[in-house]
């Protein structure tokens, strides 16, 4: 019976789509569309390009079709932009026109159909959420308030690694300890809380649920059902799992963090001057009626994924490149010892006077960009781009990884060479002052987390290189840096074992 119903549904949907296509051809506007592979009815280009739309596959398509190309993925138009000039149009010159976000069946679940800041459409709600989140998270005042905590967390990582007897011999998976550090860095800001160890049960619950959320959201496995509505019934099981994970996460955030902070606030009778952490500011906005409880939870949801995981990926990539390039690691260590003095542990203010460290961070973000396609943009209305018509509600992907790795724009881009940012690219910064290099995007929808990520990266990599010689495990000359690309993520495929030999000062 269920099979018969499914067959009828598929047949009816198929006929409806064919009719819609015919009507569209007869009545629709005549667009001058960007080039791309020839689509077929219903499926578009999906049968040709498949679900895996990672940055490297999209780069291959750009080499064939040009700096702007159109993929018809079922009912969705997907425009891929691969040049600095067109990226400037999307992100800056026409930032309002292309400033919205696309809908996605999985992200709709995890964000409550755009009740957060990152994935909401461009408009009043986005402006309100951005304003509410900026003061407690993304200002220099926040950096100065919490940088001592970041330094303490990095120091604790160093001590824990030194105490681990296996770290200096057969090696450890350093990422596990760094993950705890990143949770503590952000949970100090959010809730004035930290986790004592990797064995903390609440930390492990959070880590497991956030990891499952990332896996489900970043996978390409659900693209077919998102692109092609007649195939969506086959996604029911996947979407059910997403809904369950979302509900468990939000309940965890509410029970253990948001409600706990509310209780503390009620007992201390906090006034504005007494607000201690980000959630106090956000709950204050809720009390004023600016946002509701769901918005509060989705803000916490955003920070758990966007701030913690992306910075952790970049730290992990930076360590991997330093292990595989011992001469660069040695040069960085020499800078730290020379400019700071042996034994003087790097602090946040020190990061600004260490040019080679900053070059290492920039080069890591260039070659191993954590968000290689940025977060997708969308035009709410018909628009023009590069001399082509872009139909309303097209998904716009800026291939920021290719902008930063195109040999037409960069000298030997496949090489990990921090010196480029001290030599021919010395004026290029991570804040988007050059449209060839956009690790955090630029413009209205750029990532505000840059103000936190850069000092945390500098402090963490600096402390590790100051205190350890970082090496591949015995029997290996290098560690594996194979990539794992997602919907718009790029992390290392295998969490590597690292030998960390303590230095003596």
UniProtKB/Swiss-Prot annotation:
Task: List UniProt keywords, sorted A-Z.
Answer: Heme, Iron, Membrane, Metal-binding, Monooxygenase, Oxidoreductase, Transmembrane, Transmembrane helix
Q: Name one GO molecular function term.
A: heme binding
Which reactions fall under this protein's catalytic activity? (E)-cinnamate + reduced [NADPH--hemoprotein reductase] + O2 = (E)-4-coumarate + oxidized [NADPH--hemoprotein reductase] + H2O + H(+)
> TM spans, by residue?
3-23
Which E.C. number(s) belong to this protein? 1.14.14.91
Which GO cellular component term is one of those annotated?
A: membrane
Q: Does the keyword Ribonucleoprotein apply?
A: no
CC cofactor:
heme
- Provide the binding site for heme: 447
Q: From the UniProt record, give the pathway where this protein acts.
A: Phenylpropanoid metabolism; trans-4-coumarate biosynthesis; trans-4-coumarate from trans-cinnamate: step 1/1
Q: Sorted alphabetically, which InterPro entries does this protein's record hold?
A: Cyt_P450, Cyt_P450_CS, Cyt_P450_E_grp-I, Cyt_P450_sf
Q: Name one Pfam family in it.
A: p450
Q: Which GO terms describe its biological process?
A: lignin metabolic process
Residues binding (E)-cinnamate are 213-218, 306
Q: Which family does the similarity line name?
A: Belongs to the cytochrome P450 family.
Protein's recorded name: Trans-cinnamate 4-monooxygenase
